[in-house]
Amino acid sequence: MNALDRLTGDAQTFIDKVWASSVHVHRTDPGLGESVLSLADVDHLLTETAIRTPAVRVAHDGSVLAESRFTRGGSLAGKPLTGLVDPVKLMQLHDAGATIVLQGLQRYWTPVSDLVAELELELGHPCQANAYLTPPGAQGFAVHSDSHDVFVMQTHGTKLWEIHGEGGPGELLLEPGVVAYLPTGTPHAARAQQAVSLHLTIGINQLTWRHLLSRLIDEVIADVPDEHLPAGYLADPDLLSAELAERLAAVADDVRRLDAPAATRAQAEQFLSGRPPRVAGALLDREALARGLSADTVLRRRAGHPCEVVPDGESLRLLLGDRVLRVPARLREAVDVVASTPRLAPRDLPLDPESALVLCRRLVREGLLEVGR
């Protein structure tokens, strides 16, 4: 089951009927949230690691607290460190009713990173993830709305949400197994109930029609000569208006000649080559390569890693998420097998044994494949 199915119950129905338009509530396996980010996971991050701001912020009674209230200084190899979270200060604030926010979890907590990476590929929009740890009976923020869509998933405890907007339930008790989708601008607030509450918010930093059209039109007007406006147009506006009409008509003609399918392909390629790197296990993979691959070595597609194949003359461009890899076009059939097969061995590729090993070694080094462990 893909990420969007897990969060919504039915990905296609969500895309067709809910996306960007209305609140949606899905009830799923109560263990889903804990498998992504448990209370023990958060305890580990806050009390056993050298986590620093801005990965953590703290809010109390609707206001974000100064970092100095929960951080300390330190040093590493003789160089100063700032913004280190002080777990003692942090717990004291939490005991007093403050909400602790873990920001950008997709960058440093693997289960969250995996979920977000899958969701990005399914939606075609960049995503981020924050977690909110709220003491019993506390409310971190007053009623507000976000400038992006969000999925909210309770992982521990319960929280009573006040949700307005199209399809909003008014009040919703969020507990493990409940996932809510709130479109941009949905007013909401939430209060923890009898126990400490932990929920994960996945924010969708949506790409918009305005964003796409602005980029395309910017490319068109980049060819317009950057010449002076006529002197004296303030006294005689006709000096400006007649030529402006001609230039606007020329720009409109250029816009009409834009190739929409080509622009769509360019948008997809930009997205599929501009994601953050995903190479967890790369050191272990290199150790496995040093020991040697065989025709029967089990290889897996790395989770959340795209592999879009784009023909380009005598080459193929492989869009790997964070970069573009070029390989000879004669490898098309083998590359298609890799792109469509979650688990394979070099012997599964339609190549001679040595060529199959060479290609697999390359794709392991590039991070698309990982050696089975």
PLM segments and residue spans:
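Residue-level recognition of conserved beta-strand edge/terminus positions
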Residues: 181-183, 372
